């Protein structure tokens, strides 16, 4: 036999991004669970119109949190009712809790975008 069957066990991940669809630049903080089950808050600065956060953390947890605010402080994306308070940008902020949509009970792995829009 020339070739031997090889089996690979690969792990699947979520990659989370926030896309800015607001005409003002924003700062974004995302709180994600790492593959070792610890949690980390990652901050992204000065995300311009139609740009997205870069270099997100790999996670195999379908729950994540995010907070965003315009640089001038006039608008923000946060949840004081169902959210969670965590440190971001040197202050305690209210983060949105989000969960990845499941299709027919199956987890949708890969890239997931949250849109920050303003009028």
Residue ranges, per PLM feature:
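Intrinsically disordered, low-complexity segments enriched in small/polar residues
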Residues: 1-59, 68-119
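Extracellular Ig-like/FN3 beta-sandwich strand-entry sites
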Residues: 61-63
